[in-house]
Amino acid sequence: MGESALEPGPVPGAPAGGPVHAVTVVTLLEKLATMLEALRERQGGLAERQGGLAGSVRRIQSGLGALSRSHDTTSNTLAQLLAKAERVGSHADAAQERAVHRAAQVQRLEANHGLLVARGKLHVLLFKEETEIPARAFQKAPELLGPEDQLVLGPEQPEDEVGESSDEEPVESRAQRLRRTGLQKVQSLKRAFSSRKGSEAAQPTPVKPPRLGPVRNSEGPAEGQPAAQPAMEPVLPSALEPEPPQPTKEDPERPVLQIESAA
């Protein structure tokens, strides 16, 4: 009777095959605990992996940002290099044009030089801008000489002086030669003007007596002509003498004085 009292009764919901022991329940609970622990470990590993992935993503993002910044800087440098290349190209074109222009000028100069050398008229003078004509070029002026002396000494005097000073001072000898030739031209113009004035002054004198002759005397032009001939004789030497200071005859000489100052 005691054994029947100790036996457990039927568990509600238990299989009808037999009673469930406590050992099986414990083993099941242990298995469940081990499974939960493994799940937790897996979740922790997944969390760690997720954190590593997040860090790698951040690093990738930072690398992409640095790459974008470097790309911007490279694009800016490329733009600057392109602008510099364009400027250099424009400068190179301008330099090439200048070189072509200078080459053309050099060719023209060489052609002109060849022509001058072929003609034998090449004269090279080295001078300063503010050079003065020496004073001795103005000392011996042919103004005080007479017309006959000038005709005799005119062509010889410049050649002698040029021959003496051509070896030492070529620039001064040329200035002297130019000065003396200018003075000779001025003197020739003076002589031409004086001869013209003498002829113009001699013409009215023989004309006036025949006009007055018939009014005063009715004897004829035979007596008027000899009276006009002695009047011409004193006039001709006066044409060779220095010109009288008359106001009407000084006006043509004014350009002659200007020619002397310019020479």
UniProtKB/Swiss-Prot annotation:
Modified residues (Phosphoserine): S62, S70, S165, S166, S173, S199
This protein's GO CC annotations: caveola; cytoplasm; cytosol; protein-containing complex
A GO molecular-function annotation: protein kinase C binding
PTM remark: In vitro, phosphorylated by PRKCD.
Any Gene Ontology biological process: negative regulation of fermentation
Keyword Magnesium: no
InterPro entries assigned: Cavin_fam
Start-end of Acidic residues biased regions: 157-170
Record-listed cross-link Glycyl lysine isopeptide (Lys-Gly) (interchain with G-Cter in SUMO2), residues: K128
Record's keyword terms, sorted: Biological rhythms, Cytoplasm, Isopeptide bond, Membrane, Phosphoprotein, Tumor suppressor, Ubl conjugation
Renumbered residue ranges of the record's region Interaction with CAV1: 135-203
Region (Leucine-zipper) location: 20-78
Disulfide bonds: none
Pfam families: PTRF_SDPR
Residue segments, region Interaction with CAVIN1: 1-84
Record-stated family: Belongs to the CAVIN family.
Protein name: Caveolae-associated protein 3
Organism: Rattus norvegicus
